[in-house]
């Protein structure tokens, strides 16, 4: 399940993020990579323990917890503190094909999560850089993702993925992982489809529509059956 989530941040918020990030110090992105990923990773990151990363990361989480599409698709239990990276053409930055670590731990908070879902939140407009596509592989093939600034993509952490070399400009983004209440990706996808259908019925016929009410009951009973909290 690959889901695009528009307007997580407004254009003004993106501009403010970029001002803070441009004024911050950056470090080698391999510092947060696993052993396999570090061999194919070339980019820069904001230090995870730095003031900029912590401030902006909390603002990303706040925005997501107000986003109905994200909450419906992810059904999040824990969100890992967002990280921030930059791929520049001057260094030929890229991130080769890899899969994310199954478990992530944050040494600053002690948080440990199972990585069910990965998210990239784009912070540079696509016409300001060439290359830098996020390529995600699944059973249906490869999917290239390059979204407007402020938009995000959510995808299974079990997916092989890569970032193609940046050949002009700079690709700037936030990336992070989350543990869902619903461990099984197939079940999570079906529940998301059900929730989307309920929302559509409610918009068309109102919250008191008998079919919408019945399906809402089914939705909550499925969550009750499958949720790990």
Swiss-Prot record:
Binding site for 2-oxoglutarate: 171
GO MF term list: 2-oxoglutarate-dependent dioxygenase activity; iron ion binding; L-ascorbic acid binding
Classification via InterPro entries: Oxoglu/Fe-dep_dioxygenase_dom (IPR005123), PKHD_C (IPR041097), PKHD_hydroxylase (IPR023550), Pro_4_hyd_alph (IPR006620), Pro_4_hyd_alph_FE2OG_OXY (IPR044862)
Entry keywords, A to Z: Dioxygenase, Iron, Metal-binding, Oxidoreductase, Vitamin C
Gene3D superfamilies, alphabetized: q2cbj1_9rhob like domain, Rabenosyn, Rab binding domain
EC number: 1.14.11.-
Record keyword Iron present: yes
Cofactor: Fe(2+); L-ascorbate
Cofactor stoichiometry and binding remark: Binds 1 Fe(2+) ion per subunit.
Domain Fe2OG dioxygenase: 78-180
Gene Ontology biological process: DNA damage response; intracellular iron ion homeostasis
Pfam families: 2OG-FeII_Oxy_3 (PF13640), PKHD_C (PF18331)
Iron among keywords: yes
Binding site for Fe cation: 98, 100, 161
Name the UniProt record assigns to this protein: PKHD-type hydroxylase BRADO4652
Species annotation: Bradyrhizobium sp. (strain ORS 278)
Taxon lineage: Bacteria, Pseudomonadati, Pseudomonadota, Alphaproteobacteria, Hyphomicrobiales
């Amino acid at each position: 399940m690959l889901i695009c989530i528009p307007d997580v941040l407004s254009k003004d918020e993106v501009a403010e993020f970029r001002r803070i990030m441009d004024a911050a110090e950056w470090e080698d992105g391999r510092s947060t990579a696993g052993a396999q990923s570090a061999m194919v990773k070339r980019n820069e990151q904001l230090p995870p323990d730095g003031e900029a990363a912590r401030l902006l990361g909390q603002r990303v989480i706040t925005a997501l917890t107000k986003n109905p599409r994200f909450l419906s698709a992810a059904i999040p239990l824990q969100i890992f503190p967002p990280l921030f990276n930059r791929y520049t053409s001057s260094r030929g930055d890229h991130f080769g094909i890899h899969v994310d670590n199954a478990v992530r731990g944050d040494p600053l908070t002690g948080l440990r999560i199972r990585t069910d879902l990965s998210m990239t939140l784009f912070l540079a407009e696509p016409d300001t850089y060439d290359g830098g596509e996020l390529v995600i592989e699944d059973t249906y093939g490869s999917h290239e993702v390059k979204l407007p600034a402020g938009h995000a993509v959510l995808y299974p952490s079990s997916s092989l993925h890569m970032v193609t070399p940046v050949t002009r400009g700079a690709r700037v983004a936030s990336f992070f992982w989350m543990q869902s209440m619903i461990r099984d990706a197939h079940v999570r996808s079906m529940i998301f489809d059900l929730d989307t259908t309920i929302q559509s019925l409610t918009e068309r016929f109102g919250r008191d529509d008998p079919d919408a009410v019945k399906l809402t009951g089914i939705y909550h009973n499925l969550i009750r059956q499958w949720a790990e909290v």
